Swiss-Prot record:
PANTHER family with a match to the protein in the record: CENTROMERE PROTEIN A (PTHR45810:SF14), HISTONE H3.2 (PTHR45810)
UniProt protein name: Histone H3-like centromeric protein A
N,N,N-trimethylglycine found at: G2
Organism for this UniProt entry: Mus musculus
Stated role: Histone H3-like nucleosomal protein that is specifically found in centromeric nucleosomes. Replaces conventional H3 in the nucleosome core of centromeric chromatin that serves as an assembly site for the inner kinetochore. The presence of CENPA subtly modifies the nucleosome structure and the way DNA is wrapped around the nucleosome and gives rise to protruding DNA ends that are less well-ordered and rigid compared to nucleosomes containing histone H3. May serve as an epigenetic mark that propagates centromere identity through replication and cell division.
Region (CATD): 69-110
UniProt cross-references to InterPro entries, sorted A to Z: Histone-fold (IPR009072), Histone_H2A/H2B/H3 (IPR007125), Histone_H3/CENP-A (IPR000164)
Region (Important for flexibility of DNA ends that protrude from nucleosomes): 34-48
Gene Ontology molecular function: any one: DNA binding
Post-translation changes: Poly-ADP-ribosylated by PARP1. Trimethylated by NTMT1 at the N-terminal glycine after cleavage of Met-1. Methylation is low before incorporation into nucleosomes and increases with cell cycle progression, with the highest levels in mitotic nucleosomes.
Length: 134
């Protein structure tokens, strides 16, 4: 039989900083972290704007399309070609991107930076019933 290990005693955690004004170094560190996170967001936005890739994954989108098709065709199952699903997905993404662009313009017009549901609702109301792409 090999040597036995001694049971480890729980170690004490380091004491938390005293309440009161924080030190200058911690605020500087949090500012650089925020700045780094901001640049990461901006970098992600720029890469997404440059790319022409699809934003939705293909499998979940095809499942939603099949479910909607089954609902409106009263249980009749249709076969979908891959090219047809791809064309439908590109059209759906273009529609949503254009909708969000217009809704964001409305939020900027209202003097806000945050996009609210009421901006999207107003965009759809301005566009009308069949407010597709221009």
């Amino acid at each position: 039989m090999g040597p036995r290990r001694k049971p480890q005693t729980p170690r004490r955690r380091p004491s938390s900083p005293a309440p009161g004004p924080s030190r200058q170094s911690s605020s500087v560190g949090s500012q650089t972290l925020r700045r780094r996170q901001k640049f990461m967001w901006l970098k992600e936005i720029k890469t997404l704007q440059k790319s022409t890739d699809l934003l939705f994954r293909k499998k979940p989108f095809s499942m939603v399309v099949r479910e909607i098709c089954e609902k409106f065709s009263r249980g009749v199952d249709f076969w979908w070609q891959a090219q047809a699903l791809l064309a439908l997905q590109e059209a759906a993404e273009a529609f949503l991107i254009h909708l969000f662009e217009d809704a964001y313009l409305l939020s900027l017009h209202a003097g806000r930076v945050t996009l609210f549901p009421k901006d999207i609702q107003l965009t759809r109301r301005i566009r009308g019933f069949e407010g597709g792409l221009p």
